[in-house]
Amino acid sequence: MALTVKAAPSGVYGLGVLKTRLDLDRIHAARRVIDPIFLSTPMYRCDALGRQLGCTVSIKLETANPVRSFKARGTELVASLLTEQGRTAVVCASAGNLGQALSWSGRRRGLNVMVVAPRRAPAAKLDRIRALAAELELVDGDFEMARERAASIAQWRGVQLVEDSLDVETCEGAATIGLELAGEESTFDTVLIALGGGAMATGVGYVLKTLVPGVEVICVQPIGAPAMTRSWHERRVITTESTDTIADGVAGRYPIPAVLDDLLTVADDAVLVHESSIIAGIQMLLEHTGLVVEPSAALGVAAVLEDRDRFVGRHVVTVICGSNVDLDAYHRWVYR
C-alpha cells in the first residue's frame, strides 16, 4: 500500500478565510491575465482506467498547451507582474518545466529569461527551453544546486529571481486549476495532486478547501524524493541529502517553510509511492487513456495502485500535470 500515516490536522474549512499566503480574489483575477490557451483545460471521466483501478477516475489534462505542463498558469502571472514593474530580465532554477514556461511567458512580454537547470535534466526539457530563445546554464548536481546558482546569478546581475512555490504568483496561477475543478458539474470527492515544491498542491488545495471543502485533497510524492511529504507529517521542515526518482519534476530536497505552512492548511493527506507504481501509472495512462506523460503526472494513478481499498467507491480526479518526457527513457519504462 501507499506509504502514509494518520493525516495531520488541517485548517477549519467553510467557517472563514483560510490562513495562507493565497487570496481567492487574486486567483479569480488571474484568469484575466493568463493566456486563454492555458485555461479551461479538459476534464473527463476515463472509464477504462477506472475499471483497472477499481474506482471512478477523471483526469484534469494540463498538457495540451505550448509548454506541455501546468506551469505557465503561474509564469503568466509572474511575467505580467515583472513587466508592470518595468523589469527586463529574470532568472530561475528549473528541472525543466518551470524554465520552459517562464521562457514562453517572458518571450511573449519581451523579458530576457535565463534558466539554470541540472545537467542531468531530461534532454527534451532542455531542448525546449533553448527553442524558446532563453539563456540556459547547466550545473552539475540536482535542482537544489541549480537554485543556489540561480540566486547567485540574480544577485550578481541585479535581475529578478523567480522561485517556484515561494513566489505566491506561481501558486495562485496553479490555483486557477482549482477554480475550474470547483466549477465542474460532475461530482468528485477526491483530488490527487503531484507534490514537489508545492505550488500546484497549495494552489489547488486552497481553492478546493475554500469553495468545496468536502473534497479530500491528497498530495502524492515519490518515496525517493520525500522531503515535503515527510515535512507535512512532521509539521516542520525536513530536508534530505539526496533524491532518487525518475520523477525529476518533483525531486526537491529543501522544502520552503512558507509553502509548508500553506500545505498544512489545505492538504488532507500526503502519501509516498514507489518507483514501480509510478512506472505502472505511466503504462496505464498510455494504454487506457492514450496519454504520454512524464513521471510526475502518473503519481496520482500510482497512489491508487498502492492503496486500492482506500479509493473503492470514490470518484477520484488526478491532475495530469506534465508531458515533457525523454522519449528514450519513456520507451524503457513502457516497454521494459
Task: Specify the residue positions occupied by each region the protein language model found.
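PLP-dependent amino-acid enzyme catalytic core
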Residues: A2-R336
